[in-house]
């Protein structure tokens, strides 16, 4: 079973070995036996029962060489045994204790060679003897020592990015924002003449929403416009739908108050006018100060549980390997396709209230005008065209305060949404280019090799215990797959133990659940403005009954300039702005967590011929044969049986530490989806400060090297194939006869370096790294040349905007320190069995077998010709040769996932406040005029040129996290971090097939003469 860790499959510990399976079928017959001794002369007698082993005879005199005996024919093949019944699936056992190191088999004592006996007459050919009994399987020889460590391999190419995860669930709505301040009532202006209704304007396209600006200083109040003359009553208009509030234009300079016009006659009440079209798109406001970071989102739901994979055959537990050296930094990975956008989160909490703007300077008081007669209020007429601003009027007395303006609708600022659900696991990346072989690790001690039991169903994973010794027994058939257990916590790092015998590779399991949510990183820069549209205006009420026409009043006095009106409703959200410029390069992040060890690659090329092996133990005593006369040295016997496979090579050292990956921008909380293509951000500025490099992925243990045939140089790791179940054990060969001792052959030279293996699949991505340090503050932008824009008509005050888009990112931060090595990861999957190595050098001859009983005396035969001296039978398989030269360094591992982005850089400097416009004289307050209908929205004013940059503003509260920006270019390589802890030993691979038959050993030295045989019976007359 696997637990999720940030979307990374972490293999759980292997289940314990199941019970011993039933014995398999008998093996195939062994190779041809050695040449038998010459038969005794004379008619063969009936085979007598096997007698007890007799004492060795006294040494005899040197006899003449006898004729070479004919080789005996091979024994007949025994019938195959019945197939054993399939073993029942074993129940999961407790984790076994670590097994003791097995003792090497002792060499059998070599018998003393007896002196050669007198040369007897050549014997007649003997009958073919019955096939000898199958001897017990010899003990494995002492394991060869692994070679010295080679340089670390270079990093392999990065795998393709996985598919994006599904969007997370929508979070709960946040609390409502702060209510807007009540606007001061404007002074009543003089009643203007009603203008004729203008044509309905064309509805403008909604503009993209500008980022919410921080509360800026209050501008100087503009001058009131000159009241227009009252127009004639228009015909009742058709009731229109409520219009959208137009964007607020820049405040124009205050013009002088115009003289009050004469009050017009009250017009007939007009019908409600048509709703005005949407106003032109407003210019985006300045970037707002970042709000405080939102609370951490809820933890994402646990992903769907993967289907349990078939239970692999458990291999014997291996001993822990020695520590590996740190791998080289990895190269940058290619950004994957952009994942689908997650569901929109709830609005974040309301940002802090902006500081109040500076109060406008009061204008000089004008002379009070004469009070005019109050006219009857007329019915509201249709909207008049907006006239140009009139000349500045004289300042009058301030009028009475008007009623408070209607409170604008506050936009709801919600909290950040909960963490989205974990995405589906991405597809495995493309297979990378094969890396050169890794360095050979230190030799592990021999473990006790046992036969494997059938796999039991997977039980619940416990704490990882010490490796237990391999259980004996033949390999049973695999049991049905049990339900996957919960993954246990990784065990503490233990002292590297002895290397055990390799086990078969298990099938690769399904991808596990996503991991637990990581620690909340520092808040990122403010995100783009939400796309919640403001509410529409309410429907216009029905027109009231027309009032009685009033009498013509005297012209009123010129009114005072009105106060600023209440804030208007916000306009609809505009289209998304163009993409901002590419952000500055991010600073390199910390080292990623040590990645999981990739699967073991295919076996490397066959190693060079190994050194001559030690002599094997003495075989059991064969049946006592009839003793013949000593013959001449026989012809070379047939090749001996193939030796056992050599011990597994030492585990390779982990690769060197990877290069620091690029810092990724901070994404929303939750498991990182694959990096999307650099989409056009909103009206986003430079990319936020680069985030820290992800922590180094947890290092997996080095995979166990498959058994080499003879120890050659270590081949490169290749991709992991799904290991099939091991085949049934082959039949034990019949024991051949013992040949004469061969001479010690020369030691083989080290093998040539084999070509690198095919690339392995990319490993799982590491967990997101810890946050890096904040970037340095950004440099102020160039000073713009301000040019006063055309004054637009004042619009209604907009509502408080949403938090602004993040400001430009600061300069890239300096490279962070190397991260400490990650915790040891679980063992990687086992690789396929290694290929058989090349034949080893001829081994030293084994110890002589037990002495047979003395044979019956044969009659002396005629003296034969001296046989030719030939090579003796092959010796026992040689021990593994010395390790070959270390291969070139492999490429470094895959780059870890992009870590969360670092904190946002400090806010850029605020722009300088523009110069205040000239204050016009205050006009006389006129009579309160009738309330006119809503005017047609004016044209959008031209945006002014950028003003000079102001001094840096104080950093605002941190805003909610923004969307992840595109990944910056790759930072410089970080310095090598400290080596991580040793990875756990990988499971040993299955034993490879036996290597080819060893070379026939050179002829051994002629042994001393054997003891003389007793005189034979007299020959026939």
From Swiss-Prot:
Species per Swiss-Prot/TrEMBL record: Doedicurus sp.
One GO MF term attached to the UniProt entry: extracellular matrix structural constituent conferring tensile strength
Tissue: Expressed in bones.
Family of this protein: Belongs to the fibrillar collagen family.
UniProt main location, coarse: secreted
Gene Ontology CC, one term: extracellular space
Subunit record text: Trimers of one alpha 2(I) and two alpha 1(I) chains.
Residue stretches in coiled coil: none
Protein name, entry field: Collagen alpha-1(I) chain
GO biological process: extracellular matrix organization
Phosphoserine modification, residue list: 4, 104, 618
Lineage per the UniProt record: Eukaryota, Metazoa, Chordata, Craniata, Vertebrata
């Amino acid at each position: 079973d696997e637990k999720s860790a940030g979307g990374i499959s972490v293999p759980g510990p292997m289940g314990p070995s199941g019970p011993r399976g039933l014995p398999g079928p008998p093996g195939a017959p062994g190779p041809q036996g050695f040449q038998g001794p010459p038969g005794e002369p004379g008619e063969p007698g009936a085979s007598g029962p096997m007698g007890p082993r007799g004492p060795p005879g006294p040494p005899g005199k040197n006899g003449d060489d006898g004729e070479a005996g004919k080789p005996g024919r091979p024994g007949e093949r025994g019938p195959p045994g019945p197939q054993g019944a399939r073993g029942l699936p074993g129940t999961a056992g407790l984790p076994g204790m670590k097994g003791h190191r097995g003792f090497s088999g002792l060499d059998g004592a070599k018998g003393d060679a007896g002196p050669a006996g007198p040369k007897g007459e050549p014997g007649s050919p003997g009958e073919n003897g019955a096939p000898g009994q199958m001897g017990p399987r010899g003990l494995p020889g002492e394991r060869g020592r692994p070679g010295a460590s080679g340089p670390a391999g270079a990093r392999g190419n990065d795998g393709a990015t996985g598919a994006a995860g599904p969007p997370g669930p929508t979070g709960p709505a946040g609390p409502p924002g702060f209510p807007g301040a009540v606007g001061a009532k404007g002074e009543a202006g003089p009643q203007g003449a009603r203008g004729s209704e203008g044509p309905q304007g064309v509805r403008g396209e909604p503009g993209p929403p500008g980022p919410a600006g921080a509360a800026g200083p209050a501008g100087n109040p503009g001058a009131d416009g000159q009241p227009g003359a009252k127009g004639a009553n228009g015909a009742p208009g058709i009731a229109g739908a409520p219009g959208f509030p137009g964007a607020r234009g820049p405040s124009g300079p205050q013009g002088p108050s115009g003289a009050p016009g004469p009050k017009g006659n009250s017009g007939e009440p007009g019908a409600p006018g048509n709703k005005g079209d949407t106003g032109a798109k407003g210019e985006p406001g300045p970037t707002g100060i970042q709000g405080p970071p939102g609370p951490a989102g809820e933890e994402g739901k646990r992903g769907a549980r993967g289907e349990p994979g078939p239970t692999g055959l458990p291999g014997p537990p291996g001993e822990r390997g020695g520590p590996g050296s740190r791998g080289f930094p990895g190269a940058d990975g290619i950004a994957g396709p952009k994942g689908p956008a997650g569901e929109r989160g709830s609005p974040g909490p309301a940002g802090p209230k902006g500081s109040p703007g500076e109060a406008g300077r009061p204008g000089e008081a004008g002379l009070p005008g004469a009070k005019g007669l109050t006219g009857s209020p007329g019915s509201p007429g249709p909207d008049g065209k907006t006239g140009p601003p009139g000349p500045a009027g004289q300042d009058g007395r301030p009028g009475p305060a008007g009623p408070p303006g209607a409170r604008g609708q506050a936009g709801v600022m919600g909290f950040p949404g909960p963490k989205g659900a974990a995405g589906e696991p991405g597809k495995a990346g493309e297979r990378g280019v094969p890396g050169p072989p890794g360095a050979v690790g230190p030799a592990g001690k021999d473990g006790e090799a046992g036969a494997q039991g059938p796999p039991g169903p997977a039980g619940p994973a416990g704490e990882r215990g010490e490796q237990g010794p391999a259980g004996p027994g033949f390999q049973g058939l695999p049991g049905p797959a049990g339900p996957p257990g919960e993954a246990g916590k990784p065990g503490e790092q233990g002292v590297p133990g002895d290397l055990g015998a390799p086990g078969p590779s298990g099938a690769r399991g399904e991808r596990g659940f996503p991991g637990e949510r990581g620690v909340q990183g520092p808040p990122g820069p403010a995100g783009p403005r939400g796309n919640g549209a403001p509410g529409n205006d309410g429907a216009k009420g029905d027109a009231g009954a027309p009032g009685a026409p009033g009498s013509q009043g005297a012209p009123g006095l010129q009114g005072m300039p009105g106060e600023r009106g209440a804030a208007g409703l916000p306009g609809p959200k505009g289209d998304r702005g163009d993409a901002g410029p590419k952000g500055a390069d991010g600073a390199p992040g910390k080292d990623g967590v040590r990645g999981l060890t990739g699967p073991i690659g295919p076996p490397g090329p066959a190693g060079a011929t190994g050194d001559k092996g030690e002599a094997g133990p003495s075989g059991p005593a064969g049946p006592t044969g009839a003793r013949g006369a000593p013959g001449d040295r026989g012809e070379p016997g047939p090749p001996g049986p193939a030796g056992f496979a050599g011990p597994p090579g030492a585990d390779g050292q982990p690769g060197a530490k990877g290069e620091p990956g690029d810092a990724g921008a901070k994404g929303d909380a939750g498991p990182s989806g694959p990096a999307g293509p650099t989409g056009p951000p909103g009206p986003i500025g430079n990319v936020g400060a680069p985030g820290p490099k992800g922590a180094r992925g947890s290092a997996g243990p080095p995979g166990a090297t498959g058994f080499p045939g003879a120890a050659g140089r270590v081949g490169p790791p290749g991709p992991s194939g799904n290991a099939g179940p091991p085949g049934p054990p082959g039949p034990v060969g019949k024991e051949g006869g013992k040949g004469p001792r061969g001479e010690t052959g020369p030691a083989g030279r080290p093998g040539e370096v084999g070509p690198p293996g095919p690339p392995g699949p990319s490993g799982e991505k590491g967990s997101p790294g810890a946050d890096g340090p904040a970037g340095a503050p950004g440099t102020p932008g160039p000073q713009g040349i301000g040019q006063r824009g055309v004054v637009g008509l004042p619009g209604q005050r907009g509502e408080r905007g949403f938090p602004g888009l993040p400001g430009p990112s600061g300069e890239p931060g300096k490279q962070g320190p190397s991260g400490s090595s990650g915790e040891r990861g679980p063992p990687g999957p086992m690789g396929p069995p290694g290929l058989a190595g090349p034949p080893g050098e001829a081994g030293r001859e084994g110890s002589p077998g037990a002495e047979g009983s003395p044979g019956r005396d044969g009659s002396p035969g005629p003296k034969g010709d001296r046989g030719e001296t030939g090579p003796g039978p092959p010796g026992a398989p040689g021990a593994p040769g010395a390790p070959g030269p270390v291969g070139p360094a492999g490429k470094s591992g895959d780059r870890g996932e992009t870590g969360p982005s670092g904190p946002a850089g400090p806010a850029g400097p605020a722009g300088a406040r523009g110069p205040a416009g000239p204050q016009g004289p205050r006009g006389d307050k006129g009579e309160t005029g009738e309330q006119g209908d809503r005017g047609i929205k004016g044209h959008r004013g031209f945006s002014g040129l950028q003003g000079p940059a102001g001094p840096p503003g104080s950093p605002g509260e941190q805003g909610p996290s923004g969307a992840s920006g595109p990944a910056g270019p790759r930072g410089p390589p970080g310095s090598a971090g400290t080596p991580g802890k040793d990875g756990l030993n990988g499971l040993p691979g299955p034993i490879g097939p036996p290597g080819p038959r060893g070379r026939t050993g050179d002829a051994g030295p002629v042994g001393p003469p054997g003891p003389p045989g007793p005189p034979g019976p007299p020959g026939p007359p």
